[in-house]
Amino acid sequence: MSDTSESGAGLTRFQAEASEKDSSSMMQTLLTVTQNVEVPETPKASKALEVSEDVKVSKASGVSKATEVSKTPEAREAPATQASSTTQLTDTQVLAAENKSLAADTKKQNADPQAVTMPATETKKVSHVADTKVNTKAQETEAAPSQAPADEPEPESAAAQSQENQDTRPKVKAKKARKVKHLDGEEDGSSDQSQASGTTGGRRVSKALMASMARRASRGPIAFWARRASRTRLAAWARRALLSLRSPKARRGKARRRAAKLQSSQEPEAPPPRDVALLQGRANDLVKYLLAKDQTKIPIKRSDMLKDIIKEYTDVYPEIIERAGYSLEKVFGIQLKEIDKNDHLYILLSTLEPTDAGILGTTKDSPKLGLLMVLLSIIFMNGNRSSEAVIWEVLRKLGLRPGIHHSLFGDVKKLITDEFVKQKYLDYARVPNSNPPEYEFFWGLRSYYETSKMKVLKFACKVQKKDPKEWAAQYREAMEADLKAAAEAAAEAKARAEIRARMGIGLGSENAAGPCNWDEADIGPWAKARIQAGAEAKAKAQESGSASTGASTSTNNSASASASTSGGFSAGASLTATLTFGLFAGLGGAGASTSGSSGACGFSYK
């Protein structure tokens, strides 16, 4: 009883001193109490095992151990001395064990919850409680008068330990719930336990962070429920509020605005208003330019049109070119044709009645075009290519030799290797890997549009006085080429009509720039002759219903008197016809043989 009264007096005295001291002295006292409690001398990793050993020893010794301690005061002083000697060594170990136990709680999620390492204070409490259960008298005996100040704050340390146990238990439950979620895929249990544990993404939430999140949640839509919830659930709700700051309605509104912006960016902007009169005036200038440039029969480059005529209106050059093409068709009967999509080369083609050869030109150029038809026939009949040696073999039989000036053709070699090549009537290329170098002739791009293989075949058969079907391979190839060209022409005409309808061409806008007097324009005699030929062609088309053989003869005579060469071999083209037929007649006589063998150009000379 005396011991009990002394311990009560010591407790009263400790409380009086604690009220007078500041917080630092109280913490020092708590550290002293922790140091005076029995601490094993073994390393801190084996503290849990030592607790169980203390329990076993206390159970085995029983009352006898307590009796010995009560009888011998020296035995009471020995543990106190030992504890005081090891105070400096165990103080750091106890603090480190407490810190490591808190850090280990978050790392061991998949481990057994029962195997969580307890803090050092809890170990001491277990040993103290075990000794109390075995023998309460032994516990009272160990409380010596000298240790009374150290044992007096024991109730406060017990309260702190119980608080730590309460903080630890929900965390263990949260680990169990996360394990169940991993195995069974249950979301409700894990979310509730994570809310109870006060963790965010596997990390412990500090009190300051929870307070901040709670303040934010109090201003949000969950403020009513936040006032009725615990601190841990409040932290979880605050975390949810932070993760979803925008409501679903706000997100849907933002998605709609983004979709509307994307749709508006994809929609083509309305073109600015156009000055049709200005565009048509520039198109009329381009028509004059094209007629003047085509006199040389060299294809016209689009870059030249942009540089010389269109100039600053490069953003609307497709409409200017299309308007110029429409004016050429309606006024002159000429089609503006792009023959090379890569280099953007344009030529002018006649839409009037074609000649037998299919190539139109002035009277001065008619002999040259007659020679060109001979060359195209040789190339086509020899498989769409012919070597330069074969070409000159045929021309020598016609009296034409390289290096010798001719009265009609001038320098023949320059004509067929330079002028016809520049005009895109022929292609002149070197034979690969030839030594000494050899060259071949092919049809040029212009020849495919101004004439056709069927026309060339008929021209050759007319010279030979044969039916085109006798040349079976060439006739089949010519038929396939005509079908392909007709399909391409139909598709191109449809596309051109759609483009012109979209641009408003052909609806009277071509008169926006006012009437244009083409007779006074400096477009050259050939263009003026084309205007006259176009007028005659329209008149002939109107009289075609009542035309007869005599009318056809008079039409040919009138056409031969004009500068145009439309409507068969006219007087201007009679020289070409005479030259061509004379050449083939001489070639037939020179190349004739008793066996009826074929000549160099593939014709059978009989």
UniProtKB/Swiss-Prot annotation:
GO CC aspect terms: cytosol; extracellular region; membrane; nucleolus; nucleoplasm; nucleus; platelet alpha granule lumen
Nucleotide-binding is among the record's keywords: no
An annotated GO BP: female pregnancy
Record keywords, A-Z: Acetylation, Bartter syndrome, Disease variant, Phosphoprotein, Tumor antigen
Positions carrying Phosphothreonine: T72
Compositionally biased tracts (Polar residues): 24-37, 81-93
Highest taxon above the source species: Eukaryota
Basic and acidic residues biased stretches: 122-131
Effect of K458Q: In a breast cancer sample; somatic mutation
Modified residues (N-acetylserine): S2
Bias kind Basic residues: ranges: 171-181, 248-260
SMART domains, per database record: MAGE
Expression sites by tissue: Widely expressed. In the developing and adult kidney, expressed in the thick ascending limb of the loop of Henle and the distal convoluted tubules outside the loop.
Domain MAGE: 279-478
Positions of modified residues (Phosphoserine): S5, S157, S190, S191, S194, S197, S244, S247, S264, S265
Gene3D superfamilies linked to this entry: MAGE homology domain, winged helix WH1 motif (1.10.10.1200), MAGE homology domain, winged helix WH2 motif (1.10.10.1210)
Annotated stretches, region: Disordered: 1-204, 248-275, 534-563
Alphabetical list of Pfam families matching this protein: MAGE
Record keyword Ligase present: no
Record-linked InterPro entries: MAGE, MAGE_WH1, MAGE_WH2, MHD_dom
Recorded disease: Bartter syndrome 5, antenatal, transient: An X-linked recessive form of Bartter syndrome, a disorder characterized by impaired salt reabsorption in the thick ascending loop of Henle with pronounced salt wasting, hypokalemic metabolic alkalosis, and varying degrees of hypercalciuria. BARTS5 is an antenatal form beginning in utero with marked fetal polyuria that leads to polyhydramnios and premature delivery. It is characterized by severe but transient symptoms that can resolve with age.
Function: Regulates the expression, localization to the plasma membrane and function of the sodium chloride cotransporters SLC12A1 and SLC12A3, two key components of salt reabsorption in the distal renal tubule.
Assembly and oligomerization: Interacts with GNAS. May interact with DNAJB1.
UniProt-recorded name of the protein: Melanoma-associated antigen D2
Gene: MAGED2
